[in-house]
Structures are given as C-alpha cells and as structure tokens.
Regions:
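Transmembrane helix-loop-helix
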Residues: 23-65, 150-183
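Multi-pass membrane catalytic core of lipid/isoprenoid biosynthesis enzymes
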Residues: 3-50, 96-107, 142-153, 203-219
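Structural signal for membrane-spanning alpha-helices in multi-pass inner-membrane proteins
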Residues: 35-39, 57-61, 82-90, 113, ...
Length: 221
C-alpha cells in the first residue's frame, strides 16, 4: 500500500524518507539471512515454517494483496504459520484448535482493519490499498459478523470438548471481548485500523484480564 497517502502512516521512517530504500533493503536481507540460518540451526521444521512465512509475505506484497478475499486469507494464514513456528520451537503439540482459532481470529481482525481503512480514507482508500476498491462496507460488515460468530462457536465447542469441564463458564467473558471489539470497529475507532492499539481501550483490557484470570481458575479446578 502507498503509505504516503495514509495520514496515519506517512510519518513512518520509509514513507517519510527518513530511512532510504537501499539501506532498508540491505537491513532486510541481512536480518533475513541471519534469522533463517539461526532457525535452521535450531530446528528444521522451524526453519521451513519461517521460510513459508517469508514466501507468503513476499507473494502478498507482490500480488496477493491486490486480490479480493485472497488478501485477508493470506494475512490470516501467515498468523497461523507464526503460531505453528512458536509451537515448534517450544516443542508443544500443534492443536487443531490452535490452527482454526488463530486463523479465524486473524480473519476477524483483518476484516475489521479493512473496514476501518475504508471508513477512514473514504474516496482515497483505493489509492492507499488497491484491493479496497473491491470491498464495500456492507460486505466487510457481513464478513466481520460471520467471523465473529465463528470465533465464538469455535471457543464454545473447544470449551465443551475440553478435558477442563468448567471452562464453559468462561464463554460469557469471551463473548464480551468479541462484542466489545465489534463495537469498536462499528464506531470507527482507530483500533479498527490499528489493532495493536486495543490496549488503549480500558473495557477491553479489563475484560481480557478478567477472562484470563477466570480461565486459569477454571482450568485449575
């Protein structure tokens, strides 16, 4: 995307010209080489997972980001690969719930981000991100609702099928978090465009802490 068009992104080092493209390219190549060599020495599967993340990121930057629906699926799949890489490096079982849960949460967040960008940039949205000319607010709202529902269903099924039988009592707290984030997207909060800013929303932060504490207690019962 053309960050120079986006009022929130044009002050970034590359977009503003503070860091020159050749230096950024050199730094990227250096860090990539060091990272992949380090990953290969640690674990072969970890190496190939990181390589997959890099390849998908490159394909996304080259053309996947311009294709309707493929853009959000590619981003979400990359999040799944990151989670798998983490599971591999700490040598834990890669649960199907981990894969499906993270995939749909990523779709939920990415769709919300697209909605926020479309709402914020209006007629300039397609100049910033070409794929936005294909998306409409009603379409993104529908997708957002679908993914929100799927996330709740997945967590509910996971809770009922879990060996921790009391975990089902955490469902209402989880639903609140999804609904709160849904509200932030619908109200055109900056969090829609920048999910990392979710920590600035006090109800969401408090709700998350309560959910984590309740879940830990229920798992220990």
């Amino acid at each position: 995307p053309n960050d120079k068009i986006n009022p929130e992104k044009r002050k970034r080092p590359l977009a503003s010209g503070k860091i020159k493209t050749p230096f950024a390219a050199f730094l990227l190549l250096f860090l990539l080489t060091v990272g992949l060599v380090w990953a290969y020495l640690l674990n072969n599967l970890f190496f190939f997972t990181l390589l997959g993340i890099f390849i998908i990121s490159c394909l996304y930057s080259l053309f996947l980001k311009k294709i309707l629906f493929v853009d959000i699926i590619a981003i979400s799949f990359n999040f799944v690969l990151r989670a798998i890489a983490g599971a591999v490096i700490i040598n834990v079982f890669i649960s199907p719930w981990l894969v499906t849960g993270i995939f749909f949460v990523a779709l939920f967040l990415t769709t919300g981000k697209r909605y926020g960008e479309l709402e914020y940039l209006n007629e300039k949205s397609s100049e910033h991100r070409k794929v936005l000319k294909y998306y409409t607010k009603p379409l993104l709202a529908s997708l957002f609702n679908i993914f929100a529902g799927l996330i709740i269903i997945i967590f509910a099924i996971f809770s009922f099928s879990s060996e921790h039988k009391y975990l089902i009592w955490a469902i209402p707290f989880f639903v609140y978090l999804i609904l709160r984030y849904h509200f932030l997207i619908s109200s055109n909060s900056k969090i829609a465009r920048r999910p990392e800013q979710a920590i600035t929303d006090l109800p969401l932060v408090i709700g998350t802490l309560i959910f984590i504490i309740i879940s830990i207690i229920l798992i220990m019962l």
